[in-house]
Amino acid sequence: MHGPHPTVKDIELSLAPEDIPVVCNVQLDEEDYTDVVEPAQQAYRVVTVCPKCSLPLRLVVECSHADIRALERLLLGTLKLVCPRCV
């Protein structure tokens, strides 16, 4: 503003977002990476039948206990495994 009294033309109402650079200079030690515990992986056999032709289907998955429970919920719901012949 210039002059002893502010006028409307002297007031700038600009609310544009400003680009603020985000810089992080923190380096993690090697031991910070080793603290993360991966869930134990285990092989599970899944045996079911094709819903179209009733042929047996077998597959093996390797996952955590929580993931096999999630797969079980999907298979008990609307997810169906179909054999290659019926696709």
From Swiss-Prot:
Entry annotated with the keyword Zinc: yes
InterPro entries attached to this UniProt entry: Papilloma_E7
Motif window: Nuclear export signal: 68-76
Top-level division of the source organism's lineage: Viruses
Region (E7 terminal domain): 1-38
Location of the protein in the cell: Host cytoplasm; Host nucleus
GO MF terms held by the record: DNA binding; DNA-binding transcription factor activity; protein domain specific binding; zinc ion binding
Record-linked Gene3D superfamilies: 3.30.160.330
UniProt GO cellular component terms: host cell cytoplasm; host cell nucleus
Family annotation (Pfam families): E7
GO BP annotations listed: DNA-templated transcription; symbiont-mediated perturbation of host cell cycle G1/S transition checkpoint; symbiont-mediated suppression of host innate immune response; symbiont-mediated suppression of host type I interferon-mediated signaling pathway
PTM text: Highly phosphorylated.
Predominant location category: host cell
Keywords: Activator, DNA-binding, Early protein, G1/S host cell cycle checkpoint dysregulation by virus, Host cytoplasm, Host nucleus, Host-virus interaction, Inhibition of host innate immune response by virus, Inhibition of host interferon signaling pathway by virus, Interferon antiviral system evasion, Metal-binding, Modulation of host cell cycle by virus, Oncogene, Transcription, Transcription regulation, Viral immunoevasion, Zinc, Zinc-finger
Zn finger residue spans: unnamed: 50-86
Function of the protein: Plays a role in viral genome replication by driving entry of quiescent cells into the cell cycle. Stimulation of progression from G1 to S phase allows the virus to efficiently use the cellular DNA replicating machinery to achieve viral genome replication. E7 protein has both transforming and trans-activating activities. Induces the disassembly of the E2F1 transcription factor from RB1, with subsequent transcriptional activation of E2F1-regulated S-phase genes. Interferes with host histone deacetylation mediated by HDAC1 and HDAC2, leading to transcription activation.
Similarity section: Belongs to the papillomaviridae E7 protein family.
Domain note: The E7 terminal domain is an intrinsically disordered domain, whose flexibility and conformational transitions confer target adaptability to the oncoprotein. It allows adaptation to a variety of protein targets and exposes the PEST degradation sequence that regulates its turnover in the cell.
Assembly and interaction partners: Homodimer. Homooligomer. Interacts with host RB1; this interaction induces dissociation of RB1-E2F1 complex thereby disrupting RB1 activity. Interacts with host EP300; this interaction represses EP300 transcriptional activity. Interacts with protein E2; this interaction inhibits E7 oncogenic activity. Interacts with host TMEM173/STING; this interaction impairs the ability of TMEM173/STING to sense cytosolic DNA and promote the production of type I interferon (IFN-alpha and IFN-beta).
Name listed for the protein in its UniProt record: Protein E7
Record organism: Human papillomavirus type 94
